[in-house]
Structure formats: structure tokens, C-alpha cells
Amino acid sequence: MSYPENVVVLKSNHQLKGLFTIIRNRETKREDFIFYSDRIIRLLIEEGLYCLPFHETTITTPTGCEYQGVTFASKICGVSIVRAGESMEAGLRAVCKHIKIGKILIQRDEETALPKLLYAKLPHDIANRQVLLLDPMLATGGTVTQAVEVLLERGVKEENIVFINLVASPEGIKVFTDKYPRVKVVTGEIDSHLNEKKYIIPGLGDFGNLYFGTED
């Protein structure tokens, strides 16, 4: 199946498939789930950084020679969608030293069943930054759509957002990319479908509960 140009799926290989096999296995222990999820998250973060704009720069090496390199074109920050998105913060900090990370909390309104913003704490200059938006699962697309609305209201340009997640549904991909065609999406795998309960199939369950060892 083909997806829009703004959707990047990690190139499948035996190593990556093996990592997903472990975290999707219902028999996997929590410490192993965390360890192997972190490995996938690190790969996703690196791919997300590759999507950001760079500009050329010249530096001098210890040998006194010039080297033509590149650097980020603008400052970056992370924004995690609480709670599950917080599981991806360590992976981001592991490759981006001293990066600022904001948080957005969105929950479903029990009366309307629609996502509702409860809390947002973001860098004051976020409008001038490239934003890596973190949430491990993309099911219906409702939560991340609301999160992007918050970022746009704070002045972030749509094309300056990279949404990073581990597992997505085709339905969620379509909903999200139809609404935000200029937001880049980086995902580990796109699954088969959503079931009648809007769970990703085959999926892996509630990522936040599995990672943090809690239950709803």
C-alpha cells in the first residue's frame, strides 16, 4: 500500500522486525518491553532528525584543515503527548543534548467522546523551532490532530512539525495526513486496521501501560 510523501516508514529488515516481534509479544516481560521499545524509539528519532532542514557550514578540524559540513537550520524541541509520549523523551535526549521538551495532555471528553485539551506547557519560543511531536501509537488520529492544533495556535508552522510514532493504523494515517499534508510523519510500522473498538490490529495493546507498568 502506498502512502503520501509526507509519511516515512522505517525500512523493514530482520533486525527491526525482530524488535517489533518482542514488544508485540504478550509474553514479553516489562523490562524487555522497555529495553526493545527504547531501541526502536532511538531509530525513529534519528529518522525524524533526518527530516529536519539543514544548512551548510564550515569548521576547522584538529589538523587545521577545513571541513564542509552541515548543521540544523534552526533550533529544535520535542513535545510529548502525555502520558505515553513521555516514554519517547529519553530517546530524544540521548541524541539531542540539552533539548527542550514540552508537554501536551489530551483526554477524551466523556460526554462528547472527542479529544479535549487539559494541559499544555511548551517552550516560549516554540514558534521559531522545528518540533518533534512524540506519541507511540496512532490509532484514530484524534489525539495527535488536537495536539497539532495546539502547536499551530502557538505559532508553529505546519511544515515545521515532525510527528514520530512506533505503530500506526492506516485509518489514522489517512485522517491525519488529509488534515495536515505538510506535517511529516515518521512511523515504525503501519498495521492492518482498526477494529470495532478502535484498537490497532494486530497492535500491541496500551503502550503507556506496558511501558510504565500501570493500568487504567
UniProtKB/Swiss-Prot annotation:
Q: What residue intervals traverse the membrane?
A: none
Q: Which UniProt keywords apply?
A: Allosteric enzyme, Glycosyltransferase, GTP-binding, Nucleotide-binding, Transferase
For D-ribose 5-phosphate, which residues are the binding ones?
Y199
Q: Which Gene Ontology terms describe the biological processes this protein takes part in?
A: pyrimidine-containing compound salvage; UMP salvage
EC identifiers of the protein: 2.4.2.9
The UniProt record lists the keyword Nucleotide-binding: yes
Q: How is the cofactor bound?
A: Binds 1 Mg(2+) ion per subunit. The magnesium is bound as Mg-PRPP.
Which InterPro entries does this chain map to? PRibTrfase_dom, PRTase-like
Q: What is the enzyme's class at the highest EC level? A: transferase
Keyword Flavoprotein belongs to the record: no
Task: Give residues annotated as binding uracil.
Answer: I200, G205, D206, F207
Q: Which cofactor does it need?
A: Mg(2+)
Which amino acids does the record list as binding 5-phospho-alpha-D-ribose 1-diphosphate? R83, R108, D135, P136, M137, L138, A139, T140, G141, G142, T143, D206
Which SUPFAM superfamilies does its entry note?
PRTase-like
Function as written in the Swiss-Prot or TrEMBL entry? Catalyzes the conversion of uracil and 5-phospho-alpha-D-ribose 1-diphosphate (PRPP) to UMP and diphosphate.
| Protein name per its UniProtKB record | Uracil phosphoribosyltransferase
Source lineage: Eukaryota, Amoebozoa, Evosea, Eumycetozoa, Dictyostelia
